[in-house]
Amino acid sequence: MSLDIVILAAGQGTRMRSALPKVLHPVAGNSMLGHVIHSARQLQPQGIHVVIGHGAELVRERLAADDLNFVMQDKQLGTGHAVAQALPALTADTVLVLYGDVPLIEVETLQRLLAKASDQQLGLLTVTLEDPTGYGRIVRDEQGQVTAIVEHKDANDAQKAIKEGNTGILALPAARLADWMGRLSNNNAQGEYYLTDVIAMAVADGLVVATEQPHDPMEVQGANDRRQLSELERHYQLREGRRLMAQGVTLRDPARFDVRGEVTVGRDVLIDINVILEGKVVIEDDVQIGPNCVIKNTTLRKGAVVKANSHLEGAVMGEGSDAGPFARLRPGSVLDAKAHVGNFVELKNAHLGEGAKVGHLTYLGDAEIGARTNIGAGTITCNYDGANKFKTVMGEDVFIGSNNSLVAPVEIKAGATTAAGSTITQTVEAGDLAVARARQRNISGWKRPEKTKKS
């Protein structure tokens, strides 16, 4: 069975009180529409058609991809009208309708719904709620068969008492869709063309309406304002936390933990409070992450330790290495096994060999540091001349004294030592000691300046 997916994303979202189109508001670091597209792709459809309207150019710009077909809805005349705009592009056997502001929908739920769809059967996703205010109500006959959906504003008191609501997510036989779209009417309280009216048409045409429900009602929760957006955010984070804990991660407090990307984890991982994981993060077995850390697009090998208040982006920490507290690893930073980065150390495009140590108060940029090398406190690689970047290379077993300035391009060869306070501008040969500082001069009888007395 071939599949086309239509995602409705044309709404303005006036209750957001924002210049940003509603579907671009983020949940867990990705736009709501981005989450829906991600789920849609996992169903491997032959086409994904995104119906856009308000802020159309910005939506195109943010989400442009070869596998997306953007369809313009110039006037927002209802969900039925929106789907009708995509009709000319639909060629598959089945059409699945999704919503760009319903980001938590699970792929497994959609797969169950699609299994209900066929030439003679329409799949409808419903949800049972204690308070279904705002939802269209599912009307069933005495045999329990769905006969219609009545929108909340059009429902009478008896219909409003129904707890089963319409999510709007449908799996439809494409061969019948054009006919149903042509028969839609806007004779209702909203003056809009409701997609839900196809349910009654399908029943009249002899089709069965088969329903499915999500395991969690929050899967089908939309966001019309920022309060609802925050509820989606927190639910997503708790769901991701449960997923990671099921895979062997200890979260000190799942309510104080955020995932904003794709996270792969091993077993016996410990994550403390207020940790944010962004982008693609790989965490292997026995890793420990202290409180208040931000880790983005980074790989943490087995047994690595990230201490409190550290910020890592585009980095790789090797097996048994450690960083922090208050460490910053910028893109291109690589720590080999058992390398150590201490407090208030910043690395950028720097490679630390196995067992290398950078204890504290140091900046290393565009640097290659050999195994077992020790970098003293206050060391800085001077890698930028105002126009170009240059590299600093240190061999194995180098000892850099405290408060050194290493003016790149420069090489300090294996086993060399630099004295504290040195400014190194030339190659230091293997095993040599480099002393590059002014000789101390003491001035006897010197008197400190005195403050001028005010008249």
UniProtKB/Swiss-Prot annotation:
InterPro entries: Bifunctional_GlmU, GlmU-like, GlmU_C_LbH, Hexapep, MobA-like_NTP_Trfase, Nucleotide-diphossugar_trans, Trimer_LpxA-like_sf
N-acetyltransferase as annotated region, ranges: 248-455
Enzyme class: transferase
UniProt binding sites for UDP-N-acetyl-alpha-D-glucosamine: 8-11, 22, 73, 78-79, 99-101, 136, 151, 166, 224, 330, 348, 363, 374
Domain of life: Bacteria
Binding site for acetyl-CoA: A377, N383, Y384, S402, A420, R437
GO molecular function: glucosamine-1-phosphate N-acetyltransferase activity; magnesium ion binding; UDP-N-acetylglucosamine diphosphorylase activity
CDD domains in alphabetical order: GT2_GlmU_N_bac, LbH_GlmU_C
GO terms, biological process: cell morphogenesis; cell wall organization; lipid A biosynthetic process; peptidoglycan biosynthetic process; regulation of cell shape; UDP-N-acetylglucosamine biosynthetic process
Subcellular location: Cytoplasm
Predominant place of localization: cytoplasm
Residues involved in Mg(2+) binding: D101, N224
Linker as annotated region, ranges: 227-247
A Pfam family hit: NTP_transf_3
Stretch list, region Pyrophosphorylase: 1-226
EC number: 2.7.7.23, 2.3.1.157
Coiled coil stretches, renumbered: none
Cofactor requirement: Mg(2+)
Biological role: Catalyzes the last two sequential reactions in the de novo biosynthetic pathway for UDP-N-acetylglucosamine (UDP-GlcNAc). The C-terminal domain catalyzes the transfer of acetyl group from acetyl coenzyme A to glucosamine-1-phosphate (GlcN-1-P) to produce N-acetylglucosamine-1-phosphate (GlcNAc-1-P), which is converted into UDP-GlcNAc by the transfer of uridine 5-monophosphate (from uridine 5-triphosphate), a reaction catalyzed by the N-terminal domain.
Family: In the N-terminal section; belongs to the N-acetylglucosamine-1-phosphate uridyltransferase family.
PANTHER family: BIFUNCTIONAL PROTEIN GLMU, NUCLEOTIDYL TRANSFERASE
Subunit structure: Homotrimer.
Protein name as catalogued: Bifunctional protein GlmU
Organism: Pseudomonas putida (strain GB-1)
Taxonomic lineage of the native organism: Bacteria, Pseudomonadati, Pseudomonadota, Gammaproteobacteria, Pseudomonadales
Gene name of the record: glmU
